[in-house]
Every structure is written in structure tokens, then in C-alpha cells.
Amino acid sequence: MSKLKVKLLRGLAGESERHIQAVKSLGLKKRGQERILEDNPLVWGNIRKAFHLVGVAYRIDFSGDIPTVERDLSEKPDYTVINKNGVYTNGKGVYYFSRITDLEDFLRKKGYKKYKNWKGEEVEL
């Protein structure tokens, strides 16, 4: 089964107990902490519950005609996360989105009509 890297992008202070439990079930406790987890419905359900707090790491290569989106599974911890125009990034090509629709909206705003996803399929926007 494939894997995905999940990062806690915002702190838990002031959040409802439901959101805190969803984040803790992902194994995240502190802001900036990352975990590599199995890609399964249980994990995605918890990501959806706390979508405003966590993000899945994607590496986007804009060098070709259409951007190539890969899931970033690097083991090296990345402590630098900045919020550029509402999008969380490390400034080195890794972007954090909690929903695929957010990723597609980001690419659409950059002027792209399609992209190649991590499965090698071309996806129309």
C-alpha cells in the first residue's frame, strides 16, 4: 500500500476536542511534526476532520509543459513551513494540501489546465 507524509501545520490551542482527537490519532502532537502513514480511508478520514490543521506533502515540478505532482516521502524532517498567499510550502517545491481539490485549485490559479499525478495519470482541471 502507498504512503503519505502528514504534517501538523497549525497548533491545537483553542481547537475543539473532535479536531484534537483526529490529529492525535494521526500521531501528531506538536506544530511542525511530520509522520509517514499508510494511505488508507482511516487516515484520510482523520485528515478530513482536521483539514484546517494538517496537510499532506506534495512535491510539484513545474519544469515541463504540465506540472508533475508527486507525494513527498522524504525522511529528513523539514522544519521550515511558510504560508505564501494561503498555501503552505517549504519554499523548495514541497507544498502541503489537506484536500486534492485545494491542490487542483492551486494549479488552476497558476494557469494550468491539467497535471500529471503521483500515479502517472494526466488529470484535467
Curated annotation (Swiss-Prot):
Region of interest (Unknown), ranges: 62-125
> A Pfam family in this protein?
Ribosomal_L30
Listed Gene3D superfamilies: Ribosomal protein L30, ferredoxin-like fold domain (3.30.1390.20)
**Example of a GO cellular component annotation carried by this entry:** cytosolic large ribosomal subunit
User: Which molecular function GO terms apply here?
Assistant: structural constituent of ribosome
Listed under GO biological process in this entry are:
translation
**PROSITE patterns, alphabetized:** RIBOSOMAL_L30
Q: Where is this region: Large ribosomal subunit protein uL30?
A: 1-61
**Sorted alphabetically, which keywords does the UniProt record give?**
Ribonucleoprotein, Ribosomal protein
In which family does this protein belong, per the annotation?
Answer: Belongs to the universal ribosomal protein uL30 family.
On assembly, the entry states: Part of the 50S ribosomal subunit.
Protein name, UniProt field? Large ribosomal subunit protein uL30
* Organism this protein belongs to: Aquifex aeolicus (strain VF5)
**Source taxonomy:** Bacteria, Pseudomonadati, Aquificota, Aquificia, Aquificales
